[in-house]
Curated annotation (Swiss-Prot):
Keywords: Lyase, Magnesium, Manganese, Metal-binding, Riboflavin biosynthesis. Binds 2 divalent metal cations per subunit. Magnesium or manganese. GO terms for cellular component: cytosol. The lineage of its organism: Bacteria, Pseudomonadati, Pseudomonadota, Gammaproteobacteria, Alteromonadales. Homodimer. This is 3,4-dihydroxy-2-butanone 4-phosphate synthase. One of its GO terms (biological process) is riboflavin biosynthetic process. Belongs to the DHBP synthase family. D-ribulose 5-phosphate binds at R37, E38, D42, R150, R151, G152, H153, T154, E174. Its EC number is 4.1.99.12. It catalyses: D-ribulose 5-phosphate = (2S)-2-hydroxy-3-oxobutyl phosphate + formate + H(+).
Amino acid sequence: MNQSLLAPFGTAIERVEAGLEALRQGQGVLVVDDEDRENEGDLIFAAESLTNAQMAMLIRECSGIVCLCLPDEKVKALELPPMVENNSSQYGTAFTVSIEAKVGVTTGVSAADRVTTIKTAIADNAKPSDLARPGHVYPLRAQPGGVLTRRGHTEGTIDLMQLAGLKPAGVLCEVTNPDGTMARLPEIIAFGAEHNMPVLTIEDIVIYRKSLLANVG
């Protein structure tokens, strides 16, 4: 059903390309995962161009659990251990310990403080000692191999950033309805229309990446 509802937005390839262009322009994208999985839509921004206004939107329009998607090597470089030793969450979402910038924040909760924490973490020269633990930003470790390994929003986010030629770090939060329920695809499409954001799916990213591999082959 997801693919048929998204047909007006073009093919899977066209939807991904629209998303990549939006990210390059510093704008947000909406990514829906598989219907037999979480069946949720996440609002995603590139971490390197994230603004306070965008963070405020993530806090206001979404679940409030703002996550920073990072590749495995960055998680290791920052020495961020898993949030729990034995991950028993339904889809194995790889939360690390939460973080806060040690410098430049007050309580760490405001949009500006969360942006400062994210920019501190993704800096090329970032060190483990730059971050306090716990904090109000929740890093997620992406599986190597991206959506071809795990069809999650974490991997989809990192894949999109890399395909767009951006730093491999993205910020996401699940879109919610005004009554607090989770937004499904029809609501996600309406949200995208209201805020002029492209909508795509994890399946679209899988198709896009496989097409690139086929062309290389």
